[in-house]
């Protein structure tokens, strides 16, 4: 649906902070997105988190979900960061971690649009590995002009 080249048009992030590798579903009617991040042992964060037992930091799982939600927001508006708008992560509610994400996992990212009030967007997000939830949260983003 969206390869990394198109994703780079919709997210301002770059290595090592671009955490969406591919979008597999984008449903405008359901206002939802499904994407994934392939988690490799070569990720720079594994050098320190934790060398003897590497796990993906929870804050980066949240960031990956927020990036998927950001793509959805841009697509819903038919806009891109190059148009002068960005989404800033401003909060999360109902955050839960259920199991660690390890090197070799494919982290599936799902986001569903919940609401928009003025420039504040809310998304229901979850991350899965092998079909099992590893993280879920309601993510709040602020839309800002550059």
Curated annotation (Swiss-Prot):
Gene3D superfamilies in alphabetical order: Hotdog Thioesterase
Keyword Hydrolase annotated: no
The enzyme's E.C. designation: 4.2.1.59
Reaction(s) catalysed (UniProt annotation): a (3R)-hydroxyacyl-[ACP] = a (2E)-enoyl-[ACP] + H2O
Keywords: Cytoplasm, Lipid A biosynthesis, Lipid biosynthesis, Lipid metabolism, Lyase
SUPFAM superfamilies per the UniProt record, alphabetical: Thioesterase/thiol ester dehydrase-isomerase
Protein name according to UniProt: 3-hydroxyacyl-[acyl-carrier-protein] dehydratase FabZ
Molecular function GO labels: (3R)-hydroxyacyl-[acyl-carrier-protein] dehydratase activity
Recorded name of the encoding gene: fabZ
NCBIfam families per record: fabZ, PRK00006.1
Organism: Pseudomonas entomophila (strain L48)
UniProt main location, coarse: cytoplasm
UniProt entry tagged with the keyword Nuclease: no
Pfam family, one: FabA
Active site: 49
Biological role: Involved in unsaturated fatty acids biosynthesis. Catalyzes the dehydration of short chain beta-hydroxyacyl-ACPs and long chain saturated and unsaturated beta-hydroxyacyl-ACPs.
Enzyme class: lyase
Biological processes annotated in GO: fatty acid biosynthetic process; lipid A biosynthetic process
Compartments in which it is found: Cytoplasm
HAMAP family: FabZ
Any one of the GO CC terms: membrane
Assigned protein family: Belongs to the thioester dehydratase family. FabZ subfamily.
